[in-house]
UniProtKB/Swiss-Prot annotation:
<feature type="binding site">
    <location>
        <begin position="7"/>
        <end position="14"/>
    </location>
    <ligand>
        <name>ATP</name>
    </ligand>
</feature>
<comment type="function">
    <text>Phosphorylation of dTMP to form dTDP in both de novo and salvage pathways of dTTP synthesis.</text>
</comment>
<protein>
    <recommendedName>
        <fullName>Thymidylate kinase</fullName>
        <ecNumber>2.7.4.9</ecNumber>
    </recommendedName>
</protein>
<keyword id="KW-0418">Kinase</keyword>
<comment type="similarity">
    <text>Belongs to the thymidylate kinase family.</text>
</comment>
<dbReference type="GO" id="GO:0005829">
    <property type="term" value="C:cytosol"/>
</dbReference>
<dbReference type="GO" id="GO:0004798">
    <property type="term" value="F:dTMP kinase activity"/>
</dbReference>
<dbReference type="InterPro" id="IPR027417">
    <property type="entry name" value="P-loop_NTPase"/>
</dbReference>
<dbReference type="GO" id="GO:0006233">
    <property type="term" value="P:dTDP biosynthetic process"/>
</dbReference>
<keyword id="KW-0547">Nucleotide-binding</keyword>
<dbReference type="InterPro" id="IPR018094">
    <property type="entry name" value="Thymidylate_kinase"/>
</dbReference>
<dbReference type="Pfam" id="PF02223">
    <property type="entry name" value="Thymidylate_kin"/>
</dbReference>
<keyword id="KW-0545">Nucleotide biosynthesis</keyword>
<dbReference type="InterPro" id="IPR039430">
    <property type="entry name" value="Thymidylate_kin-like_dom"/>
</dbReference>
<keyword id="KW-0067">ATP-binding</keyword>
<dbReference type="GO" id="GO:0006227">
    <property type="term" value="P:dUDP biosynthetic process"/>
</dbReference>
<keyword id="KW-0808">Transferase</keyword>
Amino acid sequence: MFISFEGCEGTGKTTHSSYLFEKLSKKYSCVLTKEPGGGLFNEVIRNILLHSYNKQIDFHTEALLFAADRAEHLSKLIIPALQQNKIVICDRYLDSTIAYQVYARGLSKDFVLNINNLALNYMPNITFYLDLDPKIGIQRVKQFRPKEINSFDLQKLSFHKKVRKGYLDLYQKDQQKRIFLIDASKSLEKIYNIIEQKLKEVFQIDL
């Protein structure tokens, strides 16, 4: 089973994916990972993409780096884990690329999907999209992880609004009902309960 967490900056993706991993690991064989990142090679790419000098990288180059990271991530970690019937929990996946590179950066959707062709064959069974006003999200970032601010955190509010629009469009056009929207302004406990209830309801996962 493949579970992903999506959302703009400061929505709690890392917090909730980590908590779910902790809960599920008590009863199931699980893997917690993230994008970009997830392996030695992936961490090198992550450092390039999230460093402040990323502002100088061409948007197509940036998208290709994300695609390279995902291809390596899939082949070395996600696919093997799924083949071993493990539950994979991923902090960001392909939806992030569409929201950020297509909606916010303005790249062609066809270009982005073509370079991420492998990922289209391994889409999550369920995606928890944590929705929040970008202004509040950035405030959270500055408050709770001031020493970990990356190149995307530094973008203008207008950029983050485009990202959110991208996510909302993906949610509204999701015919497979893969994406489950959660109001990220709710308390951590309420969000945990919503996630647990959805997994029990749809996949009969006992937490």
